[in-house]
Amino acid sequence: MTRTTTTRKANGGGDTVKYSIIVPTYNEQLNIAMLLALIVEAMEEGTKRKEGRKIPPSSSPSYEVIVVDDNSQDQTQQTIQKLQKIEKYRDILRLKPRKGKLGLGSAYIHGLQFARGEFVILMDADLSHNPKAIPEFIRKQEEGDYDVVTGTRYLASSSSSSSSTTTTTTISSRIMNNSSSTKSSRKSKIKEQECGVYGWDTRRKLTSRVANYLAHVLLNPGVSDLTGSFRLYRKTTFQALVSSMQSVGYVFQMEIIVRAKRGGFKVAEVPISFVDRVYGSSKLGASEIIGYLKGLVSLFMRV
C-alpha cells in the first residue's frame, strides 16, 4: 500500500481520524501554504520515530487540518481552495469559513463542530508555532495519557514537565528563502532555540510577561504559560470544557486551562519556541489588551 493510499484511507470521506488540527485564520494568505507544508512534514516524518526507532508510514497517525477563516480580506480562502486541489492536501485540508471576526475562542469552537479526531490540536496560522513540535505534544500525551498538553514559552527544558524542546530552524530557513525583510533576517539567527519568545521587542515581551504574571496572581492556574494557544486536547475533554465557557476572545485560553485544572483533568506542558510573525500584522492591539484585562478580572470573579 502506498503512502498516498494509506493517507486517503485514514483521512478521506467520513472515516474517523485521530488528530484534528484547528487553525483560525484572518488575512494569512502569505503564511497558510507554508504552515500546511510544515504540518504535513511534521506529521509524516516526526511521528515515524518512537523511542528512537523508525516506524512504517502506515503507522503514522491519521489527521486533518481544519482552517477556520474569519472572512479574510486578502486571498486566504482562495489560497486554501487552491491547496485543496493538490493531491497530498486534498483529503486532509478542510476550510470552514465564518462571516466575520467573532473571536479566537469561538473560532476554535466552530472548528470543533467539524472535528472528527479523537484529539484536537490548536495552533496559530502565522508560523509563530512550529509544527515540528506537534509530535512532541503527541508523545507527551501518550506518555501520561493526558487530557490536555499545553505548550509553554516560559518553562526550562530541564523541567520535569517535559524532556523535549522544539526548534525554529526549519521555519526560519524556509522563510529566508522567500523574504529578505528585517524580521526574516532576525529569524535566521535563531539556532536550535529552547523554549522562549523570539523576535519580539522589549515592550511586547514585557506586555506578555506582565499579562502572564497577572493571570497567575489572580487565577493560580498551575501551569507556567496561561496565555499560550498551542495546545492538544482530548476531544471529549475539550467539548466538556467549552460547554461551560463564557470567553470567546484571547481570554478563552486562560479560562479553559483554569477550568481544566480545577476540573481535575490531567494537564501536562511541553516547552516550545514562539517566533514573531514575518508576514502580515499582529492581531494584538490596544483594544485586545483592554479586552484581556477586563476578561481577566471577569474570569477572577466567576471561575
Regions found by a protein language model. Give the residues of each.
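A conserved hydrophobic helix/loop-capping motif in glycosyltransferases and polysaccharide synthases
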Residues: 19-28, 35, 42
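Acidic helix N-cap motif at the loop->helix transition within catalytic regions
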Residues: 30-34, 74-83
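Conserved donor nucleotide-binding strand/loop of the catalytic core
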Residues: 62-66, 77-114
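Short beta-strand/loop segment that forms part of the nucleotide-sugar
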Residues: 23, 36, 48-72, 96-97
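Cell-envelope/extracellular polymer assembly enzymes that use nucleotide-activated donors
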Residues: 18-20, 64, 255
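A conserved acidic beta->alpha catalytic loop
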Residues: 69-78, 127
